[in-house]
Every structure is written in structure tokens, then in C-alpha cells.
Amino acid sequence: MMLEGEFHTHMLPEFMIERRQDRCIRCRVCERQCGFNVHWYDEEMDMMREDEMKCVGCQRCAVMCPTNALVVKPHPGNYKPNANWTRERLQDLKKQAETGGVLLTGSGNDKPYRIYWDHIVLNASQVTNPSIDPLREPMELRTFLGRKQDRLEFKYSEDFEDIEITTELYPNVQIETPIVFSAMSYGAISYQAFKSLAMAASEFGTLFNTGEGGLPKELRKYGKNAIVQCASGRFGVDPEYLNVAAVVEIKIGQGAKPGIGGHLPGEKVTLPISVTRMIPEGTDALSPAPQHDIYSIEDLSMLIYALKEATNYEKPVSVKIAAVHNVAAIASGMVRAGADIIAIDGLRGGTGAAPKMIRDNVGIPVELALAAVDQRLRDEGIRNKASILVAGGFRCSADVVKAIALGADAVYIGTPALVAMGCTLCQKCHTGICNWGICTQDPYLAKRLNPEITAKRLVNLLRAWSHEIKEMLGGMGINAIESLRGNREQLRGVGLEDWELEVLGIKGAGE
């Protein structure tokens, strides 16, 4: 049980605030900008003061200070050094002793697991094959997501001038870049942030994922760029919701919290969110850990084809899972069950809220999962029957290029999009207080995010990454993204063990 009444915490502050009094003009901007009530004005002393115990390090006050009077940095106070009992472990124990609760956190896994992208390098053309200048020659990043035919058959006219495809084509979705916005639900993020993603995806010609919280009626005009989720809570799912979208995704798992469900507290379920999710206002939105109609591959197949039936077989159906130990076998079953797209969310996938112990200890890196899945599907001769979307830890365009060379068709990005909006990874998404207006339902905080401006920032990010991808493709002498897909000869490992190179399916540098 949580300690009540007056008691003195045993925890140390996480951050310290340095205030240049010679620069501070007592404008109280820092006080107004901080939703955690860190700053306050001392009338008697005519100076600003701060409660460092409340500071989460979001940097909003420092960024908005008109005189640059504030510096927020990690607190130097520490316990006696101990290799086994780090500061973080001690702080976590003390917090649980005071609250009696599960430790919650936001964002993705921040532990020092090996980041395989940083141990993989790309190839470049030298002498024997020419490189391509993307500024002067066309480069193709257009990607099609969905099941592909084994072969195409054509019917020719007698004079061979007219050609007709006789093969029945599966529904595919066209995107102009192999980058898609990850699932972030309305409720977990603000309406303004949600709308920004929709607007940016629509403008650039890619997709955004609604998450499991439904799609507001007024934003369904962006449906042709939406991946809508059918998750365990079935929030917001109705025929219109399914048919307005480009892709329907069955959410089985999430990289940040494999094997558990979700919980949106009632205080976040405002009237607009309750209408979108189709639940009473102010009630907790609980997503069960499993989908209670899926306990086998056969059950999954039934839901896949039920959704295909509901959408008149006009939408690709995706199935999203967390990257776990037997991910390759699971993915094979998903494809055979009828999934047109398989989405794999890795160990570093972000979240609005997750138990810290699960986020930091459950699942495997997406690099290894992707390589294993792509190889398994190729070995079984079914790779063309589904596209592979991967998520969880993509930080830059080079990560995207390496993922495609490992076998991905496209990647989800979540945290980079949030950072483009203003996020500083303070990891307090679960509190409902976000000084940048992203992960909050507080109208005062949410209005800080202007969808028109934020959408432009997101479009700029997509444009910059896409141009960098073209530069890297050109350097390899490749002019179309599809020629890179699964082309592991363009990759080499640096500083990796033999077993890691084997799983990744790449050679060591110099080979």
C-alpha cells in the first residue's frame, strides 16, 4: 500500500536545475510551461525557486526560457559506487517501497543491449560498377505492401498491341517511401499529435497507424492513408472504421510489452475519446492480454478472413506481433493463416505506458527477428505471400536501409516522429502530463501542439530521410528500393560474434 501522510522520501532527485539569477527576469514562463509544478515564484524573496524532486528532465522550461537562464542536467548526487547495485536499481527499490506498485514507464527500452544497426555497415560502388547520382537520375522508393502473386499471366491480342493481365491481383497499398508512422492511439497521445501524424502521412503519401483507440469521425478523410487496428479491446471497431482504411491490422503484441494488455486510465477517457473508442466517458479502457478469440493459428485465420470479408477483400490484412524467441515459426504460421502483411515490433519499441520490468527484459532485438523471419519465409517458399513491416528502435535513415537489406519491405517509426514533434524522451508518457503537448489529454498542455506546424515538421523528417535513402542506394549502384530488399550482400558485420553473423545472414567486414 502507498505510504500516506507526512513522510520524507528516501529518493534522490533525478535532475538538478541551475538558474542564472543574473539572467532570470522573473517572467514566470518556466512556471507556466511546467505541468509537473517544478517552478514557483517566491514573492518574499522576489525570485524563482524550484522543487528538483518533481523534475523529469523534459527540458521544456530551458527551451522556452527567453533569457536562457536555465540549465537542466542529471543530478550529481549518487550513492556509494556498486557495480551490482546501480543508482537506478536503488531508486527503483525505494520508489516501490514508498508506493507498493508496479514501476511504470514510457518510451522504449533504454538498456545497453547491443544495437546491431551500429555493427552493420553498407556497401558502395567502386570501379567495377558505377554509382548513381540521385540528384540527376531517377530513384524509386515507391513500395507496395501486401501479398504478391507467384507469377503473372497475360493475354495478348492477335496483333500483340494490347496486353491484359489475366492473373487475379491481391489488394496492395502503394506508399511513396518505405517509412510508415507507428501505432499511436488517440488517448495515449493528444488529438493534436494524432491529427499531425494523419496530415503528414496524407501529404507525403505514406501511412499512419491509428493504434487501438479508433479513428475519430472528423479524421476519417485521412482513411486512405490509415492502418486501423483491431486489438484485444476492439475499441472503435465498426464496419465504417474498417472500410475507410487502407490496411486493417490485427494487433497481437507490442514490442515494449509482449504478452500483456493495455490500460488507458479513466481520467484520460474524455468525451471525444469515449465517443471514438465507443466506451463510457471516464471509464478505464482495458485491453486484455490475449485476443480472446485467438488461441491458435486456426483462430487467427478465422479473424483474418472475417476482416477480409468485412472489407470485401479490398484491404490487405496485417498481423502485428512482438519480436519473441520463436518469432520465425510464428510468422510462418501467420502467413499461412492468410496475413498479407506481418508486422514485427522489436525489443526497443516505444510505448505510452508499460511495466518497466517487462519493457526492459522481454523480447528480442528487431534486427535478429527480422533476419530470422525473412530467411524462414524464403526457406519455405512463401516470402512473396506477405510483406514484412518492422518496428522498434529505428533512429535514422541508415537503420531503415539496413533493415530493408535484411529483408523488410518497410519500417515503422514512432519515437523519431515524436522527437520531431518536440519529445525529449523524459519517459513520463504514462503520467498523462506532457509539457510538449504530445502524450496528454490536458487541454492546456495539448494546445501547445499546432497540427499544421507539427505536420510540416513530420513531412520534413520523411523528406530528409527519403533523400538520404536515395543517396545510400545510389552509392551502392541501386536505383530502386525493391532491388535492395533482402540483398544481404550489401551488408557486412563489424565486431559481431559468429552466431550473430549467422542469424543476421551476413558476412564479416573484409570477407
Curated annotation (Swiss-Prot):
This enzyme's EC code(s): 1.4.1.13
Swiss-Prot/TrEMBL GO biological process terms: glutamate biosynthetic process
Keyword annotations from UniProtKB, A to Z: 4Fe-4S, Amino-acid biosynthesis, Flavoprotein, FMN, Glutamate biosynthesis, Iron, Iron-sulfur, Metal-binding, NADP, Oxidoreductase, Repeat
UniProt GO MF annotations: 4 iron, 4 sulfur cluster binding; glutamate synthase (NADPH) activity; metal ion binding
Protein family according to the UniProt entry: Belongs to the glutamate synthase family.
The protein's name in its UniProt record: Archaeal glutamate synthase [NADPH]
PROSITE patterns in the record: 4FE4S_FER_1 (PS00198), 4FE4S_FER_2 (PS51379)
The protein's required cofactors: FMN
Name of the encoding gene: gltB
4Fe-4S ferredoxin-type domain: residues covered: 15-44, 46-75
Reactions catalysed, as given in the entry: 2 L-glutamate + NADP(+) = L-glutamine + 2-oxoglutarate + NADPH + H(+)
Binding sites annotated in the UniProt record for [4Fe-4S] cluster 2: C34, C55, C58, C61
Natural source organism: Archaeoglobus fulgidus (strain ATCC 49558 / DSM 4304 / JCM 9628 / NBRC 100126 / VC-16)
